[in-house]
Amino acid sequence: MDENLITYAIPYYSGIGYLRMALQSLIDQENPNWLAIVLDDRGGEDAEETVLSFKDDRISYVRNETNLGLAGNWNKALSIAKTEFVTLFHSDDELESNYTGLILGLMNRHKGAVAGHCRTRVIDASGGNLWSLPDEVKKIIRPKGNDDIVTQGEEGLLSLVKGAWIFCPTLCYRKSLLPSGGFSNAWKFVLDVDLTSRILFDGGVIVGTPTVGYRYRRHSTNQTALLTQSNIRFQEEIDYLNHVSMRSSEIGWKRVQRSADRKVIVRLHLLYQALRAIVELNWSRIWPLLLGGIFGRLKS
């Protein structure tokens, strides 16, 4: 398959205004070597008219016959892409104009890499720069330097378990090297994090560039915000780390197992959310979050 071409598979359910901005950021790419597929999972806002309005033959539209759910739509996106490189471009995010060239260059420098990622600029609903404490923590945890970042083996997974510093929406996948099964429908939030750990458990390599190439949007109606408010996000992170601990124990990755058992970054995030709930006088959330932060267990 052509390694100088990338497919942007765009799973879509709702948020037509954000989708329009996402597609415009595609049109604005400095490197024109891309294709795009919008996969409409039968949400409330049909996207066909918006997609066709761009009048660009590189952008195609598929409306699923039934709602496939998050994992199902993501796996379909991977399966119908015709190129070796595929980015699951979230429909409420935007690309910096350099993303295509940046990621193609990265993946072609590392021919054996299963996936590649870049740095992110976090934006708000209107596209302005957004500051948040969890994002600042990621900046502290992530590897430093100006060279490409190579993540592999026990050491690589240990760094991700200590703090999930890769912004998974930026990941571009090399289809031919992906683990079998794709994204697991067992998850609603940690699908891509789970896939990165399976890549590393299987001996694969993930590479990254310290250059910013993506704009990740935080807003009140996106999946992350909704699952954070319902605590499903934290329960999944705890369950995921329990799974990583079990798998690490089986193959003798003791340092990963110990870190997964401690769940430090998740517990700190729970305590941070508990403090926010106290400030907001959101009494129904305070105790579950506090107990989760202290004991590393949470029931949604």
Regions found by a protein language model. Give the residues of each.
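Conserved donor NDP-sugar-binding/catalytic core segment of glycosyltransferases
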Residues: 98-138
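Short, acidic, metal-binding catalytic loop of nucleotide-sugar glycosyltransferases
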Residues: 24-33
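Catalytic core of nucleotide-sugar-dependent glycosyltransferases
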Residues: 201, 211-220, 225-253, 289, ...
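Short aromatic/hydrophobic "clamp" motif used to bind/position activated sugar donors
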Residues: 86
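A conserved acidic beta->alpha catalytic loop
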Residues: 32, 40-49, 66
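Glycine-rich, basic loop-to-helix element that forms the pyrophosphate-binding segment
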Residues: 47, 64-81
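Acidic helix N-cap motif at the loop->helix transition within catalytic regions
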Residues: 45-53, 94, 98
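Conserved nucleotide-sugar donor-binding catalytic segment
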Residues: 137, 142-230
